Amino acid sequence: MPDCTAAPFISHACFFFLQCTVSPLVERFAFPKNLTRGKRLRVICTVTEGDLPIEVEWWKDGLKIGGSNPASAKFGSQGIQVRRIDEYTSLLAISFLETTHAGNYSCVASNSVASFSRSATLTIRGEFIDLKLEIPRFH
């Protein structure tokens, strides 16, 4: 909106305020290979560009981690935690990996202009159990 000011020797002067807001950009992240049950995991999501305020969220398989609906609230009971480190950084932490933690994780950064997300797939290698079954024979 123009801000017009009158001066004694000038008939009018108009000033325009232009505000440009930069949309967020999220750095690529990846999960380590060869993860197995029982290990710990820490992954950082970093927003490398964008004007504040920026909201950073983690999602798993299309559900927001730490969200208010019952489906996404289950992540806390599964040992998945999200910690905000600063305005541009968020940490995803799992203290004891289970096969149920496997899936597609996304870090989504949003501000008043746009949202930007990066995704990676977490794979948990299963444990091989050699079962020897004896089938009873009936005579």
Task: Report each predicted region and the residues it spans.
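Immunoglobulin-superfamily
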Residues: M1-C4, S11-H139
